[in-house]
Amino acid sequence: MWPLTALLLLVPSSGQAATLEKPILSLHPPWTTIFKGERVTLKCDGYHPLLLELQPISTLWYLGHLLLPSHKKSIEVQTPGVYRCQTRGAPVSDPIHLSVSNDWLILQVPYAPVFEGEPLVLRCRGWYDKVVYKLHYYHDGQAVRYFHSSANYTVLQARASDSGRYQCSGTMRIPVESAPMFSAKVAVTVQELFRAPVLRVMGPREARGAALGGVVLRCDTRLHPQKRDTPLQFAFYKYSRAVRRFDWGAEYTVPEPEVEELESYWCEAATATRSVRKRSPWLQLPGPGSPLDPASTTAPAPWAAALAPGNRPLSFRKPPVSRSVPLVTSVRNTTSTGLQFPASGAPTAGPPACAPPTPLEQSAGALKPDVDLLLREMQLLKGLLSRVVLELKEPQALRELRGTPETPTSHFAVSPGTPETTPVES
């Protein structure tokens, strides 16, 4: 009875066995290319169930598809090929590719994957550690660093742009200085630490602690599986102004008065040291049929109610775009109730003009930012100033224009694709 009880206590739970991770295979020294005749050490670190402690712990080693005879946790090898290891009850480890060279010069790169923000170290090594002179490092055929003698090339914070094919060249004294020699090219890939974030509007059931009438935005991203424990911080912006600086929370509540300008928001994700920073695109409002679409829900969302036609304040509307372009635009007298001018061609924050309108845009109309209003006022001021200049420089011409019954022409520049004007009430 007692031996059976002991066995039951040593057996891992089914949940623990189901979550066994693959062992970690490491290389010492950490270079994937060595000279012929050299040896390196491979070490396999993995989880071993307690039940197996009753027997000698066994580690399986593979060279390609060949099972090696050793069952130790570490082995010394000098044969080129692809190595893997496996512990009982766990999957096979990730591979390590070992290369053996007979050249005078080799370029050594680390075996472990290099992620964004981490240092990338390259080592140009002469035959059995002979000193290399006039050392050059190349990235995709372009020289990136020069050293007088043997030295490592280090990129302190690697980026995706640092991926590519590397090579080194130099001379050695054997016994006199040789002609420049080149190593074989080695491919290096900098892994993405996390994806570029995407800003989205959270539904009523997803939002937590949202202020009444506000809208909760979430900055979503995904870490690499091998770096899923890396902490990230998030910041939120409205146009170029930070509405919340970097913090650990991935959510931000937009106050109710600012709900109408949701498309002017974007976010940024970064590591705690800011070694890797990535920004999101502008917020894209939900399309038709989505859970956040006001027309597809029985209870309207707070931001949908705030954007209803009867609740939104007055705003300038962008005139429709036409293919025909008029040459000039008429301007009324200053004594009239308004002044006509061409619409601004400045870009606005939000989706492109060619994107199909969403139900929210059809019901609430185009949301114009303060920047567009400022540009329109500047154009109005430009028109008034042009009339003042005309009166100062050409008084006679102005009197002749005033004496004619026809409406004077405008001195405004017409932006392409603006067939009509928008009156602004004075």
Swiss-Prot record:
- Which residues fall in a compositionally biased region of kind Polar residues? 406-426
- Could you name the Gene Ontology cellular component terms for this entry? cytoplasm; endoplasmic reticulum; external side of plasma membrane
Per the record, the coiled-coil ranges are: none
Give the intrachain disulfide bonds: C44-C85, C124-C168
SMART domains, sorted = IG
Q: Which residues carry attached sugars according to the database record?
A: N152
Q: Give start and end of each Ig-like C2-type domain.
A: 23-101, 103-189
BP terms from Gene Ontology? cell surface receptor signaling pathway; immunoglobulin mediated immune response; negative regulation of immune response
- Which positions make up the signal peptide? 1-17
Return one GO MF term.
transmembrane signaling receptor activity
Subcellular location per the Swiss-Prot or TrEMBL entry: Cytoplasm; Endoplasmic reticulum
The region called Disordered is annotated at 400-426
Against InterPro entries, the record matches this protein to: Ig-like_dom (IPR007110), Ig-like_dom_sf (IPR036179), Ig-like_fold (IPR013783), Ig_Fc_receptor (IPR050488), Ig_sub (IPR003599)
Keyword DNA-binding assigned: no
Keywords on this record? Cytoplasm, Disulfide bond, Endoplasmic reticulum, Glycoprotein, Immunoglobulin domain, Repeat, Signal
**Tissue expression as described in the entry:** Expressed at low levels. Expressed in B-lymphocytes. Detected in tonsil, lung, kidney, spleen and placenta. Expressed by a small subset of germinal center B-cells in tonsils and by melanocytes (at protein level).
User: Does the UniProt entry include the keyword Cytoplasm?
Assistant: yes
Name the major location.
Answer: cytoplasm
Name the CDD domains on file: Ig2_FcgammaR_like
Q: What is this protein called?
A: Fc receptor-like B
- Which species is listed as the source? Homo sapiens
Recall the taxonomic lineage recorded for the source organism.
Eukaryota, Metazoa, Chordata, Craniata, Vertebrata
Q: Which gene encodes it?
A: FCRLB
